[in-house]
Amino acid sequence: MTKSTDPRLADESKPEEIRRRARELAEDLPQLAKIALEAMIRDHNPDYKGTANKAGRAGMQSGNVSELTAIAKVKPGGADRLRRIFDLTNGNMDGAQRVSTLHDMRFVFFDDDTRILFATTYDGDWDTYINDFATKIPGLMDLLFANVEGWPGIDSPKVKDFIADHQIDASGWFVANPQVTVVDTRRYQRMEHALDDFLEKSRANA
């Protein structure tokens, strides 16, 4: 039984800890049993089968999909500058589409705009993903992350160390469709559009 690192439980005696854990287990048991049953069913459908592997140097990977979460200090005025960039793009960073493994990127400011949380979901392993940023959208990366203290530049040999030093691995990582990549999604969209066009033309010619 691993001792909790929560400082609020520092004064908890061993009997109190055992009683607390037993109470928590009793409360969690019905839902845990349901999760276990769903996992047994999911094991028979490989399309839904996830994993809890490392994504490479840092982060977690489930199936084909990986996560990256990093927290860093923002330069004075950097949060306002980034907000202006986000307002101008209006949720459409077209250049980022060139990274064919990128699912999404999220930027969250906190501690009175002095720190930023960057979270992204992507396909494949960590090193390849960072290389894609460096080779396909270097200008966009430097435009955004130049507002972060200590950013060495995307073409710097130190950039991977910088990212890894600020990255925090997820304690839990769930993906609804862990085997579906960005390339798969785009292919499915093209197939759907082609089918819709075919059906529409068929109805028009009927």
Residue ranges and their predicted role:
Residues 147-161:
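Short proline/glycine- and acidic-rich turn/helix-capping motifs at secondary-structure junctions
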Residues 106-149:
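Active-site/pore-lining binding-face segments in mid-to-C-terminal subdomains
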Residues 2-115, 124, 128, 157-206:
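Short S/T/G/P-rich N-terminal loop/turn motif that feeds into the first structured element of a domain
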